[in-house]
Amino acid sequence: MNVIKGVVAAPQARVAIAIARFNNFINDSLLGGAVDALERIGQVASENITVVWVPGAYELPLTVKTLVETQKYDAVVALGTVIRGGTAHFEYVAGECSSGLSSVAMASEIPVAFGVLTTESIEQAIERAGTKAGNKGAEAALTALEMVNVINAIKG
């Protein structure tokens, strides 16, 4: 039986991080976790990490698509935070962001990791950005690296 398993170490990987500025008091922690995970656990050199800031989560899919199309990166990590409010705005932004990022990932051969928090409250977002529930930015970064290795192993 042939089993393919990914590892997270990818020292030669070139990784782009697209991050939303809206809710940056939370997203800054996601970014810190992602960069730390890439460098410390994934062994990615800092010069191989590019960070691109965009206004909000809705702008992430187009930005990630553009990054993927440059063919400069082995993986892209999308980071942001969408917090439910009193209107339907949450559903539109969260849904389009998720759908758009998924479409980019499926249309390309480059892993796109989803590190966008979609929470019911600010407290939930803070918990997922490095306190009680870990750091989802770090998790997304490690997912991106593991997928780089899995895809490379599948392609042989």
UniProtKB/Swiss-Prot annotation:
EC numbers: 2.5.1.78
GO process annotations (BP): riboflavin biosynthetic process
Residues the record lists as binding 5-amino-6-(D-ribitylamino)uracil: 22, 57-59, 81-83, 114
Catalytic residues of the enzyme: 89
GO molecular function annotation: 6,7-dimethyl-8-ribityllumazine synthase activity
Reactions this protein catalyses: (2S)-2-hydroxy-3-oxobutyl phosphate + 5-amino-6-(D-ribitylamino)uracil = 6,7-dimethyl-8-(1-D-ribityl)lumazine + phosphate + 2 H2O + H(+)
Binding of (2S)-2-hydroxy-3-oxobutyl phosphate, residues: 86-87, 128
Keyword match Transmembrane helix: no
Subunit field text: Forms an icosahedral capsid composed of 60 subunits, arranged as a dodecamer of pentamers.
Protein name from the UniProt record: 6,7-dimethyl-8-ribityllumazine synthase
Source organism per UniProt: Photorhabdus laumondii subsp. laumondii (strain DSM 15139 / CIP 105565 / TT01)
